[in-house]
Amino acid sequence: MNDTLRMKKWWMLMLLLTVVGINDSLAQAAPAAAERDVTPKYSNEFLNIGVGARALGMSLAQVATVRDVTSGFWNPAGLTGINSDLQIAGMHSEYFAGIAKYDYAAIGKSIDSVSAASISFIRFGVDDIPNTTELIDAGGNIDYDRITTFSAVDYAFIFSYGRKGFPFGQGRAATSSAGSGDAFRWGVNAKVVYRHVGDFAKAWGFGLDAGAQYDYKKWHFGAMAKDITSTFNAWSYTLDERTKEVFTTTGNEIPVNSLEVTLPRIILGAGREFNIKKITLLAEVNALMTTDGRRNVLVSANPVSIDPGLGLEASYNKVIFLRMGVGNFQRVKNFDGSDAMTFQPNIGLGLRIKNLQLDYALSDIGNVSDVLYSNVFSLKLDIVRSDRK
């Protein structure tokens, strides 16, 4: 059995597992959804914002060409691109004029010549939210001193493993970023999600991802199946009698323990490298396919919608980087009732000094889309043992 046949069988297996996972998830969600909507759109959406200023500058087009510790988020197959003993990355960004804060940190390690692993941490939170349930005292008087604050925070821990070669048989595990042959890589994620809203509500969730990458000369191909078996978030609520009374008086529904299901999404990508002396040009296009029903994206259908993204990167001697991208195509309705298509253009810069890389991205330049612009900075550090330098 040659490598090409193994590769085809592996891609077919990934596709089959994804389809089976989607069908099984929809089948499990349907009975419960008849009583309560347990498969809402944008479930665990904080896990789809993206990590790394490089990726954000390229409009999230990463699944085929990512090769560093951020692969634990984008495609665990790319972890095999870690060449140092340890690689550490971090990012901080703020949204909605600083109201929401997004933090990311990851550490990855090359296990041997064909495998690598990483641990990633993500926090997305809104802090200091006023709690006005006790604003009015027993005498009916407004007392602002009774206002307290709480936080609504989402956490995720992602444990990733990537490996070169085909899972079935030895296959060919040679790297080929410079066109020296073809290479296949695969990877898996196990993620734990914890979300809480003050002391009132909390949820635990668990999910699995699977990804693969394949290089042919200067072409790169990738596939990522997120929440391949669906991610189940078990919500529990703790409300005291006073809070329940306030909810009833103000016409709010008292929440009950429930199960929220995050349905699978598939990302397909293709990229191409162009080398001109010390200048390297990289272009990648991704197609994000969601399975949670019709969305207002470029290709809108039920249950699968497709949102494309395009990213470009130019580098000089792998030291200075200039990036741009376009994505987040949205169908929006104007005030006059007409429909319009918006998109989000991004740009980015990068600078590598020895083992340290600093990246910057500016999203939604020119305020073209309905999304507010954001400035994003990220760092990446390679740690190499002194005996290997």
What residues fall within each predicted segment?
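Bacterial N-terminal signal peptides
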Residues: 12-21
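Sec/Tat signal peptide C-region and signal peptidase I cleavage site
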Residues: 22-27
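Hydrophobic alpha-helical segments, especially transmembrane helices
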Residues: 7-10, 324
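Short linear interaction motif-like sites in intrinsically disordered regions of transcription factors
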Residues: 11-12, 75
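N-terminal secretory signal peptides that target proteins for export/translocation
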Residues: 1-7
